[in-house]
Swiss-Prot record:
The keyword Nucleotidyltransferase does not apply. 1-deoxy-D-xylulose 5-phosphate binds at K125, S151, E152, S186, H209, S222, N227, K228, E231. Its EC number is 1.1.1.267. This is 1-deoxy-D-xylulose 5-phosphate reductoisomerase.
Amino acid sequence: MHNLVILGASGSIGQSTLKVLRHNPGRWQVLALTAARSVEAMLRDCLEFSPRFAVMVDEAAASELAAQLKTHGSATRVMAGPAALCEVAAHPDAHSVMAAIVGAAGLAPTMAAVRAGKRILLANKEALVMSGAFFMEAVREHGAELLPIDSEHNAIFQCLPEAIQRQPGFCDLAGAGISKILLTGSGGPFRYTDIGELAHVTPAQAIAHPNWSMGAKISVDSATMINKGLEYIEARWLFNAAPEQIQVVIHPQSVIHSMVQYKDGSVLAQLGNPDMCTPIAHALAYPARVESGVEPLDFFSVGEFSFIRPDYERYPCLQLAMHACQQGQAATTALNAANEEAVAAFLAERIGFMDIARVNEATMLALGGTAAGSLDDLIALDGAARARAHNLIEELS
């Protein structure tokens, strides 16, 4: 039986992963589930999937979960704290680790799984945005296997030659006959909104994505299109791509999840209904194919595909991320940290929608040139960028 650890089990990706498992009973054994503090969801899922371990980052939540599991006669062992995340991610009995903790908090346990040589199902894009070169070097050094979960990167992965699939991050795209990666995005809920109205966007409007069901933070990131910018940075590291080998294309229907253009003029694309269960099922079973529970694509109901060039006045965060990628690792780390803080402030109605870009840009300009020669340096830079962003948010509040 293939043992699976799900980091971030109560989140959108974690719940979609459990959906795929339900469609494939007996194929995977859940070794561990983790969450921050969602006791109710973890209790339900622990009783259904009977993991050996359950980790709650919050100690009070861990105590509550342990007490409730005990009343149900569950044998699941409850652990607490960030160190426990790393412990289960690197557990000797774990075969695959779904890295689905949102944000910088997911870096340490994901890196622990990498250093233990696990098969990493990477849904935490911040791990690469924050620590790209260090992360990929650890993958190579420890013989870990990396499979992308983001729908776009999973689509690109599926469109690449098998030889490149076996060595992502260290491949030669041009040598394999590839001229360009085409990274698609819906453009979010405001692609047709008058630019002058964007300053008045509310959190409720920003999280109402037209195509995908996602968590609040990633929904706001989609609305600003920094999500696509972070994916641009992620693609740079995942596929060893130069900035000029990646092009962002707005595709409102969210049916073509990304494409790869070859030198002979061919373009390979991966299509499907916009449901994260598809890339999750692909990565879980790779190189096999299993049921995902997603309805087959009905081309007649889709009707047509359209493509739009990004407007950087509408999406300044996208342009910031592309510039950060060209500038280097410190810039992408600072941008990611600032964005997490800015989005949290926007969701708390402390700053406006367009203030997110202002906080991001000012933080990146201040700290993007910082020297960072180690992972510890990047973690320190992440903290400094958050402090800088906090100060900017206070000024805007």
